[in-house]
Amino acid sequence: MKKIILAGGCFWGVEEFLSRINGVVSTEVGYANGRTENPTYEDICTKNTYFAEVCLVNYDENIISLKELLAKFWTIIDPTSLNKQGNDVGSQYRTGIYYVDSSDLEDILNSKEELQKSYSKKIVTEVKPLENYYKAEEYHQKYLKKNPNGYCHIKLD
């Protein structure tokens, strides 16, 4: 089982999209690479904590490779938009790929470099090791499964 943490704006839609991919075993939303300990949703929205809303993805690399997973991820974000996805604006909505296994870095950078060829604007999606991660509150987990008509900046169908 492999793990990658992906930030693509509001984590509700990112989680729903990723959870539908064959080979993704489990997903969880949370807050990553911020400046404080144990942040709440209110903290990341109103204070200068610099956490990103993220989706932690556990996947079976025998079914889907990181390269394939990232290719799907790139389709749901605007990688050239800094701190904004859809109508959501703020550093918590930045795009990012946070890795826990340093052997994944080469595949991540190659994927980003390949994608850059199809954009005239610079890709601003950050690629960093995971520094910290806190699971989001329970009401955020599988939000769009619990609230099928909930807000989502991603076209899921």
Curated annotation (Swiss-Prot):
Protein purpose: Has an important function as a repair enzyme for proteins that have been inactivated by oxidation. Catalyzes the reversible oxidation-reduction of methionine sulfoxide in proteins to methionine.
PANTHER family for this protein: MITOCHONDRIAL PEPTIDE METHIONINE SULFOXIDE REDUCTASE
Reactions that this protein is recorded to catalyse: L-methionyl-[protein] + [thioredoxin]-disulfide + H2O = L-methionyl-(S)-S-oxide-[protein] + [thioredoxin]-dithiol; [thioredoxin]-disulfide + L-methionine + H2O = L-methionine (S)-S-oxide + [thioredoxin]-dithiol
Protein name from the UniProt record: Peptide methionine sulfoxide reductase MsrA
GO MF annotation: an example: peptide-methionine (S)-S-oxide reductase activity
Keyword Oxidoreductase: yes
EC number: 1.8.4.11
Keyword terms, alphabetized: Oxidoreductase
GO biological process annotation, one example: cellular response to oxidative stress
One Pfam family matching this protein: PMSR
GO cellular component labels: cytoplasm
Origin superkingdom: Bacteria
